[in-house]
Amino acid sequence: MFFEARRSLHPAPPWAPLPLKSSMTLRLRAESPADHAAIHALTEAAFRDAAHSSHTEQFIVDALRARGELSVSLVAEMDGKVIGHVAVSPVTISDGSTGWFGLGPISVLPAWQGQGIGAALMHAALEALRQQAAHGCVLLGEPAYYGRFGFRAEPGLVLRGVPAEYFQALCLQPPLAQGEVQYSPAFEATA
């Protein structure tokens, strides 16, 4: 099920670290079929020069969509152009906990990075999960960045093969799940 943004953020959300150009309007909304090619292209561009990337993130989003596993898929649109995207999909946890999701990939076109668009997408995705009564969310990413959204490494939640400090969780409804987390097979997509 997709989350539909009920309002435009104009000119920028209050949590944006840098103001957007005053003549621009940022709009967050659920993806539509017409957005698929733009999401693929912007995801590829966003991760093209990232040293930490497998450079398959665009294929992961495509595979999640093909499997019907995009629980939340939001785009950031500026003056009619899709410039950002966030994907959220279900994860499984070895303790049997339900209602947990993985956030990512999250992408912003390089020319628009550092202007609060990623933060706006993060807040909107987490709000969509709250509206779905999700129990929690996990992600793989930079602790210094994602910590400001409430994410932190939890010793009881493990993603095999990943340094513990980069695998982070946000519990939305206690209790916190415990165990090994498994993402969708879509995360193995390479084309």
Task: For each feature predicted by the language model, list its residue ranges.
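A conserved beta-turn-beta hairpin within the catalytic core of GNAT-like acetyltransferases
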Residues: 91-103, 113
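Active-site rim helix/loop that mediates acceptor-substrate recognition in acyltransferases
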Residues: 40, 47-92
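A short beta-loop-alpha structural element at the N-terminal edge
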Residues: 26-39
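Conserved acetyl-CoA-binding loop-helix of GNAT-fold acetyltransferases
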Residues: 103, 108, 114-127, 139
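C-terminal "cap" of GNAT-fold acetyltransferases
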Residues: 138, 159-191
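Conserved active-site alpha-helix within GNAT-family acetyltransferase domains
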Residues: 131-135, 140-164
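Conserved GNAT-family N-acetyltransferase fold
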Residues: 74, 84-86, 101, 106, ...
